[in-house]
């Protein structure tokens, strides 16, 4: 990861820091959009989706993992704050909102696809149907791409939205 390169830490150290419950609790107490959801069992990468993808200018000569994380979460705060009221009106957690956004982004070929995909998924959820997203199955399998086999759809994982209701 780029954070490992910039800080001089190993990728394992960065991931360990981002999975450390005491550190995550500090972040939960600092950022309005983080909650105990990221501490739930089965969450593969607690901060996934919360670290805003951007090119950051780092002026510190020896930045820490914590400083880099703060920069990314501060940027997430800036961008996500504009949707705060919308998220509340949907009766969704921020985690659910970001999960749905991630699925839509991966399912679509380009931004013009996103509203159509969102509409299909929202209709499925509102009708009590399974989400049935191939992307979530691939995520469960640790794969990228678009090809999903019948055997893949049998994967028993909470991320498999062909088997489990709601959002992963």
Regions picked out by a protein language model, each given a short descriptive name:
Residues 7-9, 23-168:
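Bacterial extracytoplasmic/cell-wall-associated proteins, especially those involved in peptidoglycan
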Residues 9-20:
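Extended intrinsically disordered, low-complexity coil regions enriched in Ser, Thr, Gly, Ala
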Residues 1-6:
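Membrane-embedded segments
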């Amino acid at each position: 990861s780029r954070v490992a390169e910039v800080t001089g830490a190993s990728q394992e150290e960065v991931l360990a820091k981002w999975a450390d419950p005491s550190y995550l609790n500090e972040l939960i107490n600092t950022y309005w959009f983080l909650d105990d959801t990221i501490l739930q069992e089965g969450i593969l990468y607690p901060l996934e989706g919360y670290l805003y993808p951007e090119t950051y200018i780092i002026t510190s000569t020896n930045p820490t993992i914590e400083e880099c994380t703060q920069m990314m979460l501060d940027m997430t705060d800036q961008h996500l704050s504009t949707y705060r009221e919308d998220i509340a009106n949907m009766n969704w957690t921020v985690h659910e909102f970001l999960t749905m956004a991630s699925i839509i982004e991966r399912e679509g070929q380009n931004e013009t696809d996103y509203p159509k995909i969102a509409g299909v998924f929202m209709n499925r959820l509102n009708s009590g149907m399974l989400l049935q997203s191939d992307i979530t199955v691939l995520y469960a399998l640790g794969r990228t791409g678009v090809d999903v086999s019948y055997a893949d759809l049998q994967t028993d994982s909470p991320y498999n939205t062909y088997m489990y209701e709601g959002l992963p």
